[in-house]
UniProtKB/Swiss-Prot annotation:
Protein name listed in UniProt: DNA-directed RNA polymerase subunit Rpo12
Entry's EC annotation: 2.7.7.6
Entry's Gene Ontology cellular component terms: cytoplasm; DNA-directed RNA polymerase complex
Cofactor(s), by name: Zn(2+)
Species of origin: Methanopyrus kandleri (strain AV19 / DSM 6324 / JCM 9639 / NBRC 100938)
Cofactor annotation remark: Binds 1 zinc ion.
Length: 51
């Protein structure tokens, strides 16, 4: 049929990293059940301001 596409998200409530299948209907945190999860950002090098 189709391959499982699992992506890593971060829960907005408990802060844990969760691997979710995006084809699954309710996208929820597997630890606390919260519905809002976000994709983690890549680390960005900081630019220091000149003084």
């Amino acid at each position: 049929m189709y391959e499982e596409e699992k992506y890593e998200y971060i829960c907005m409530r408990c802060g844990k990293k969760v691997r979710l299948d995006i084809n699954e209907d309710p996208i929820r945190c597997t630890h606390c059940g919260f519905r809002l999860v976000m994709k983690p950002r890549h680390p960005v090098p900081r630019r220091y301001k000149a003084r």
